[in-house]
Every structure is written in structure tokens, then in C-alpha cells.
Curated annotation (Swiss-Prot):
The protein's role, per its UniProt record: This is one of the proteins that binds to the 5S RNA in the ribosome where it forms part of the central protuberance.
GO BP term, pick one: translation
Name of the protein described by the UniProt record: Large ribosomal subunit protein bL25
MF terms in GO: 5S rRNA binding; structural constituent of ribosome
The keyword Plastid belongs to this UniProt entry's keyword annotation: no
Length: 95
């Protein structure tokens, strides 16, 4: 099973900006590793939440399209809300 997500570059940083994203059904994330600079991105919460229900999400290489460029990544870390079934933040490492 392959996973492909559309993302946009995140310009606003910080707690307030992240809270606004989460309130609007989005989740902040970061892509790092390899020879490129880290990129802060925004993903659709529901699409990622549905995909993470599959075991393959954690083991396979995922494709994230950021500004028209495809990034091959693996999930490095996921932060979840302690009481709600919500994702708070994701870390991806370039494959």
C-alpha cells in the first residue's frame, strides 16, 4: 500500500499558529534529514489520521508533495492528543 499526501509549506511558527492550524482541521509537521534543510509543512488531519490506522503507514516509505516537489519520507515520530483522537504533530525523516 502506498501513501501520498499533499502538503503546503508552513510559514507561521509557534504555539499560536499551530493551534490555529489544528482548529482548522490541519496538523503541523516537519520533514528533516538527508542533505536538504528541514521543511515545516501543513497536512490535512483527517487524511493522515485515516492513513495511520494502517500498519503500513509506519513501515513504508511515504510520498509527500510539497510545493510541487515529491519527498520520500518515513514516519519518525507522532505526537497525539492525550484524551482526544487527534494528531498534534508529525515528524518525517527523508528516506
Amino acid at each position: 500500500m502506498s501513501f501520498k499526501f499533499e502538503a503546503e509549506v508552513r510559514s507561521a511558527q509557534g504555539k499560536g499558529a499551530s493551534r490555529r492550524l489544528r482548529h482548522n482541521g490541519q496538523v503541523p509537521a516537519i520533514i528533516y534529514g538527508g542533505n536538504a534543510e528541514p521543511v515545516s509543512i501543513i497536512l490535512d488531519h483527517d487524511k493522515v489520521n485515516n492513513a495511520q490506522a494502517h500498519d503500513a503507514f509506519y513501515n513504508e516509505v511515504l510520498t509527500i508533495v510539497v510545493a510541487g516537489k515529491e519527498e520520500q519520507v518515513k514516519v519518525q515520530a507522532i505526537q497525539r492528543h492525550p484524551t482526544k483522537p487527534k494528531l498534534v504533530h508529525l515528524d518525517f525523516k527523508r528516506a
